Amino acid sequence: MSSIHSKVVIGEKRREMSSTAAGGSLPASIMANGSGKPIKMEMKPIVGTTAAGKGHGGLLPGSGDKHESWQMELLMERLRNKAKSSQYKSFQEMSKAVRMSLLEKRYALDAVEKSNLQKTLDSMQYCIKVTSRQGLVERLDCLTRQLGLKLSEDTSGLFISSDMFYLEIILDPNGTVQDVKVHHECKMKQQSCSELVSCLQRGDFVDFTTQLEGLASIYQLNAEKKIKVNAFVALQALETDLYNLYTLSTQHYNDIHSLLLKSPLGVVQKRRGGHAMKLTYYIAPYDLLDLEARKMKPLNTELISAEKIGYSVAVNLEASTANKLQIQPLLVQQGNSPVYSPIEKHNSTSLPATFVLRLNKPMALNVAMLKQIKHITGDSSAVTIDPATSNTCLMSLIVQHASNGTVNNIAKGLFVTLPDQYHCYYMTENKNLQGTIISSIPFTEPQHVSKILVFLRQQALFNQLLTSCIRNNGSSSTRMSDYEHLVVFEVAALSCQYITVSLEHPFEESIAMVEFDLRNILAIQVRVFCNGYESDERISKQVSLIVQRTMSIPVTLRGLMKIWQEDYEVKFKGQGNGGGNGTVDEGNFSLSMGPDEGGGNGPAGPGGGGGGGSAMNGQHNGSLNGSGMEFCDVKKVKLEPMDQSKKRRGVEDFCRSPKSSKVESEGGNEAMDEEDDDDEYDESTNLSSGDSNSLGENQQTNAGQSSSSTAAMGAPAPVSTVGPRNSVSGNASESSGNSSILGSLDFSSLDPDLMRSSNSSDLDDTTEVSEPEVKVKSEEPSYATSVSITPIGVGKSTSSLTNSVLNNIGLDKRPGIEIIPLANAGTNVPSSITITPIPMGSSGGSLKSSSDNSGDKKLSSSSSGSIHRKSGSSSSSSESDRAKLEKKKKRRHEEQLAQLQQMGPPHKILSKSTDGPASPSGSSRKFSVSPVPLKSGSGSSSSQIFLSSGSPGSGSKSSPKHSPVHHSSPKHQGSYGTSSPKHISGGSSGGGKPSMSALKSATSSGSPSSKNGSSGIGGSGKEEGSSGSGSKSSGSGGSSSSRDRDRDRDRDRGEKRSGYSSSSSSSSPKLKTPAVKLKQLDLTNCGSTVSAGVQLELMNSNSSGGSSSGSGSIDLTDSALFGIGATDLSKNASAAAASAAGMLLLQQAMKRKGSLSAVIDKLKSAQGGDESSLMLLPELAQQAGFSLKDASTPGKTASSSLPVASSSSASSSTSSTSVSNLTGASLGSASAAAAAALAAHFSSAAAAMQGKTSEYMVKPSSDGIKLTIQNKKGSKSGSSSSSTSSSSSKSSSSKSGTKPSISSGSLPPKKLPSSQSFSGAYPPTSGSSSSSSGKSFSSGSSSSSSSKAPFQKSSSSGSLSSSGSSMRPSSKSSTSSSGSSKDKSRSSSKSSSSSSAAAAAASSLMATNAAMAAAAQAAVNANALNVMKMLGLTSSIQNMEGFVKTLDTKFQIPKLSARSGGSSGSGPGGSDIEKLKQESRPLSSSSAPTTPLSNVGQSPTGSNDFSLPFNKLPGDVSPLHSTLLPNVMQKMFSGHDTSMLMRRSPNLDHQSSSNSRDGFSSIYGKGSTTPTTPTGSVPPPFPSPGNVQSHAMDFSNSSDSADASLMRPPSRPSSTMSNHSSSDKLIDATTNSNSMDGLRSTSPAQALAAAAVAAQLMNKLDNTQQFVAALKNHHHHLSALSLSNAAAVAASQLAAAAASASSGGSAGPGPVTSPTSVSVHIMKSPVPSPLPLHGGGGAASSSSVGGPDEDETLVGVSGK
């Protein structure tokens, strides 16, 4: 209690104190102080008052002024007294007093303050719910006051009045509105308005206000009251006429849609109270979406009236100058047609007003339309225009307006996310389409309205379609994971009635164009163009229905791609018919190879062009069933009834084609297990009997038989009915004279179903080529595929994988390698792939001769010989294989000699086509430029895909035609850069004959060096000789010994995967030739070579000297890498082959070694100087299009040479160890970079292991430059390699007779300009050279192995960073083809180093010191753009002849020393190599593996066909590439429809091949032949960022525009059309197609390499996003392949090293500094790299259309 009490006391005291302080005792204290007397207070005294008062008395007054204290105290006292006397008043009284005092107007109120006060009161009023009459009156009073009207209250109701009208509102006693009547001055009586009644009854005062405004606006005229009276009269007269017209139109247009879109006025709503008449003329489906129900609301007039949807105009009257306006209705109905009476005095009056159509929302209108509208209305008054938007580009204006200003730069991509697709749209501005924003349109007569609405409706439709590409959900655009699945589109408008959308065909390596014809708004027509031809009517109808239902471009394009996908799946299920019409112009890419042993010199027939048809072997008169068959699944193709010979051909596998049989019999192919043959025969028979009697399948399975049987018979067996297949596998081999390669293929291990699917597409691609090729080849020995890769333990489950793989490979099946993906384990289980080397009798010699034959020979001789040996021979006994190989060699040699005799003038077209079939580019495979190339795979990477050394073999064969020499030769230049027939036949295994020297070299050494020689020969006789000599002496010499050893090893290890080192070497030369000819072609040549072109030649450390036994070499690149491999491999090559074979090999290697890191460790240890060098060219390297070869020449060149060119000139072009030659050029550059890195890593290790003399030998090969780096200590290698590089390029250019740039590959000089870097024939601008250098780089590298000059050009292109500077010297060096092999080596080395800037980066890994020099050079061009170029971004474009042309001839390849790191590393043994291969392969696969598009896969034809590269790309290649590629392709290859890519239709393939000449597949069948240069080179064709895209990765050229528009698709649809149409006419287009193919194939691979290298090299996401995406794809692929972290790390390290090298940074990781002996075959990569994605700048654009929910709903409505 005490405590409580104390608390209370304290509380009391506190209160007392506070009250005192507050003044409770203040008055008393003040008074006390003031008066000196204590004052009595009425308040109860407070304890401590005195003290408090005294204490505070002096302080509180403040200053202590007594006077102030007195005043306050007196006042307080007065108040107290007053309150006391008056007693306290009530609150009401007080409040009233306050109010009265406030109302006293003592001060004048400020007008502003008064208005603000009124606004505040009004705002408060709006928040008060009207529940009584008084509340209603107050609210209406507030509204009317704001509108300037008067409100008066009467007993009966309320009146709202103005000077011209008044409203009477009748209320009941409760305040409920009963009626509202409107009375206008001009009217005699009031009119009841139900609209106003309803809005007041429901308390909608906002609407009531709007109606009052509408009524008041009628009279807002500057005139007297008596004049203004007529305003409402005139407006009513107009409304009467309009409604009468609408009533008439409803009789003619029964349904709401036609009424809305076709009737004169649309849907008309009469005036409702104060609401003006509304005309709705267009409604977008987006406005009808019911997001909750996920459906579309039914369109009807009630919905239009109830909801404010669509585009509409209100009919109003507004003040203006004086006009004569009607005061009476003018519409008179005469019959069924309305007639307007003229305006006269009696029916009109003059008013200072005009009628106006006020748009419900501002609209962007075309200025041309606005002028027409003004013309209609007589321009009585200016249309209301937003001055800020006057005369700006219409599309930009639409995008800005639709995005609410969030998107200001349409150069950035506009990202749209659909339920299952991710799109990026680039708007290509048309300067002729100027626009402005309008909000109203004045008019004076009723007939004007319908005419004005025609334009507004057209504009609304146009705006709606473009607006459908704009979204608010742009945040997702920045997610890199989306880039993998991103599909890029370019939207352009020729006028407001035509919108064109360009995209990359997902399945046909081409650009597709979708044209929206908006003239008939009710029935929009969509036309789809693929490969220059309009798609069938069915597709157009389906797409038209979708766009009519959705009015959305993204949803429509999604439906189109779904249709393509369905067709593609049906095709590969054998349900579809491949309808290819092979024409001589389109398909005649198979040049007569010269009379084969058993055949005459018939003119090359059109048979080569269509993959679907079968070409007659001996007669060259094979007619292709389909010109576009390359992209068609052969299984889908229904072959015409065949005569007996045709049937026989159909039954026999291409591997068993007569040529193959011959070669086999000669080469001992007869020794092939009969069981295998029988099995194969049965399989082939079954296949052929099946719906898919695709040449590919039948040929593959039957080819082995036929080749065996024919060989036994000694007479050329008719090519299997599957011409393309035969040409790819059998014919390619045959043309190579390696038909035995095909025969040697072990088809027994192949799954017939897989074969069927894979072959079908290959057949399609190769049928045309193969048959003509087969004719020639049949006479020549045909080589069975050396390698058969069959997934083991896979049931039918492989079908899906097979389909994908086959799709990729189908275009480009190579006889050399059969990779059959196991359903589920394509890449999982290394063991699931059996790689059986099949000994090829005359691997070297045959390869040579076959290289003379169009790409087929090239393929079969090197790739086919070695690869086929591998594949088929593995099952056969070693002795049989050896015997066969020897026989094949002899036959090849004979064939080559025959070819030389037959050489004659070069076939320009054939040259390209040659490349096409064998090389990755689509044209070769499409056309039987080289009857053999498709078979042999030299032209079509598929045949070369065979893991065995066959790839080199085929490379050799195709090499002559494709070899830099060929390309270099003026002839070759004349014809699409491969004008010389040698070029054509050799490089493409087409009609060109190898030079005698080449033949001699091929003949002299069956070893790889011989093959190299042959490939060198391919370009031109003397150049071949030179090249061959150069190759022999510098690279070929080593290569020869390697080749011999390889051969021996192949024989010994026939069952092993290793192919002949010689074969790989040879294939690389061949690849070179194609690569040189066209980078794409190079890829094709490498096709087999390129795809498989990277031959992992296991240079056994056991092997003496530089040429460790070459038998270890595995030519996986061609078909495996590019999916161009023969039969299955070719299809799978791009995805399955690369991923499966590479993956399996890599996995095997990993399993054997435990991991890639283990292999690398071994390699590193090998770097220590281990004598044994395992030149393991990872799949990446193969993809990059180089074969790993151990050159035995210790002094001259590195013991191991990587014929990068062999794998794919285009890929090589990517200039890394061309590991990335996966997709020809497309994957090639990225892949090459990665591969180069890997290869460099391995190579450095291998070099260290070998401890061979440190020398770099560069051999120009037809495909590119072959770098042989022999580095005892690693320091030496740098200088050596650089010297070799320059030497190689010199020799190459000199020999070919063409400028180095021309020699740089299949690309004709014209195309070469873009890849000027090839031989340096074309002086490149710094930027262009850099860009072209990316492509050149590959070619240069491959040329080092095969052809000297071509690849050197390519090499220059290849060296991304140093390509510009390097190229110059390289090309110069190329010119001296006759230089000693050392010189050649130097030239090659220079070219190679320059061209392989990326490779250099990889090389730098291998040889840090050597790489440093190259890196320094590379650093010059090391900027992001250069890096991209080096990576092959530019290569891809450069692959096209046009691009090649633009390349700087003088471009110098960085010294090999810098690049040597990029070359492959050597490993302890063949198994290691295989392991590395597998590892590398997965890596390369990874580089572009994520792209499932078959378009990524290399086409069988090779790099020529733009569409082919995608087909060739590994199936795993990320869609990003394809997505990006479409833009690039659009720009680069306007002719190549994406649809081509998408469907790989035979026509497309064929066309693209022929069109490729321009560097663009011709979409329209005739396109300007202007090559699309990367950027600088071919700016005219593709001035838009598209150029950059076409160089997708060519950052150097595109750096300026790359940042802003790298991702942009080409902006010249018209140019594309012209290019396409022009290309179609050109058979040379094959080369271009090849180049395009190469580009395609390169882009994924190069994207990989670029991704790896560029990711680190480039800081600009805009430029590097594509790389990043590619890199991501690569990593995905790696993880998918279950690559160990070590492998990934190794890959990344390699990439980093490559990046540093290319950037001119440190040479590379110390561990990889110096390979003992590295042979880098750098091939030109024609394939364009994927477009770099912009940072998603456009993604943020907001769209008026709406978000994902709306898109998803609309997708559901679209019906697709």
Curated annotation (Swiss-Prot):
User: What spans are recorded as compositionally biased (Low complexity)?
Assistant: 726-744, 860-878, 928-958, 1004-1014, 1059-1068, 1197-1218, 1276-1319, 1326-1380, 1388-1401, 1481-1494, 1567-1576, 1592-1615
Spell out the Basic residues composition-biased ranges: 959-970
Region described as Disordered? 1-24, 575-624, 643-785, 827-1078, 1188-1218, 1269-1401, 1455-1510, 1540-1640, 1701-1760
Which Pfam families does the record cross-reference, listed alphabetically?
Med1
Cellular component, GO, one term: mediator complex
**Keyword Nucleus appears in the UniProt entry:** yes
Keyword terms of this UniProt record: Activator, Nucleus, Transcription, Transcription regulation
Q: Which residues form a coiled coil?
A: none
User: Looking at the keywords, is Transcription present?
Assistant: yes
Q: Which GO terms describe its biological process?
A: positive regulation of transcription by RNA polymerase II
Location (main, coarse) = nucleus
Q: Where is the composition biased (Gly residues)?
A: 596-615
Q: Name one GO molecular function term.
A: transcription coregulator activity
Compositionally biased intervals (Acidic residues): 671-683, 762-771
Q: Report the superkingdom from the record.
A: Eukaryota
Task: Write out the annotated subcellular location.
Answer: Nucleus
* Composition bias type Polar residues, residue spans: 684-711, 911-927, 1495-1506, 1548-1559, 1629-1640
Family note: Belongs to the Mediator complex subunit 1 family.
Instruction: Quote the function comment for this protein.
Output: Component of the Mediator complex, a coactivator involved in the regulated transcription of nearly all RNA polymerase II-dependent genes. Mediator functions as a bridge to convey information from gene-specific regulatory proteins to the basal RNA polymerase II transcription machinery. Mediator is recruited to promoters by direct interactions with regulatory proteins and serves as a scaffold for the assembly of a functional preinitiation complex with RNA polymerase II and the general transcription factors.
Q: What is this protein called?
A: Mediator of RNA polymerase II transcription subunit 1
Q: Which species is the source of this protein?
A: Aedes aegypti
